[in-house]
Amino acid sequence: MSERELTYGEAVKEAIAEEMRRDPRVFLIGEDVAEAGHPFKTLVGLVQEFGTDRIIDTPISEPGYAGIGVGAAMTGMRPVVDVMFGDFITLTMDQMVNQAAKAHYMSGGKIKVPIVFRTTLGATRRSAAQHSQSLHAWVSHIPGLKVALPSGPYEAKGLMKTAIRDDSPVVIFEDKMMYRVKGPVPEGDYTIPFGVAEVKRAGRDITIVATSSMVPVSLGAAKLLEDAGISAEVIDPRTTWPLDKQTLIDSAKKTSRALVVDEGYERYGVTAEIASVIADGAFYHLDAPVKRMGAMDVPVPFSPVLEDLTVPSERTVFEAARALCRR
């Protein structure tokens, strides 16, 4: 497969378009997804190709169109339900958690719910407390849901295609600050399997497990660590559920130190789960306690100066890793 560069947003759109051409059961529904092309312009042009029967604009009613999507999935369609801000998945909780996630189990496996909830996460866009939250830990907690967090354009396309083809409900969180980030994306068809982590950078002194936009942040920190004589291994889990526990454990056993970085809150969050996995599986190989880094325990501020302080940065990840290595 030949490669070219796409932005993260272009990769998402290409994945959806290719799957809609491949499978007539796929459709997309949400607010401002047709003529407006999505608030972040990631769907521009799709309605012109597929029409308003398959790119469906809805009123401002997340519970309503989420319910339409769940019902359509139960009856054989493959909907992509677009929730423009991750904060608004709070309005879809009954449809997502009580209906989509439960139907397969409650029907004894007779009902499949092949639905994708596509939404966002991430701060530093100056969108204030109600449009900047990272709530992926909430849904990672729910049996019956799969949760993907693409960290770049390649992952954005591959994970979306996997999600649309999956017979289970999938929630994809896209970091809205990454939509213009460019990266290599193969031209041919490809998918990325769920539950398979990727070692983004090999190292020997410390393992840094990072999700979503914290992957490039951690790779930047790894370069700073290299200058300080510390070799950092950076791992992208890609999915918080299913979680590739073995890759994380094996890396921590090799390096003897682990740092977990995520943009969600530390309290009862993704970092806590991953840290416990590493502590349980690699305890006798660790030379230091597993450290966690996440968002500050406050609503996301509107002030640019304060907002930037609430999430991990290359510098803070570098300092935390260096402290773990006692350098």
Language-model features and meaning:
Residues 1-169, 173, 176-327:
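Thiamine diphosphate
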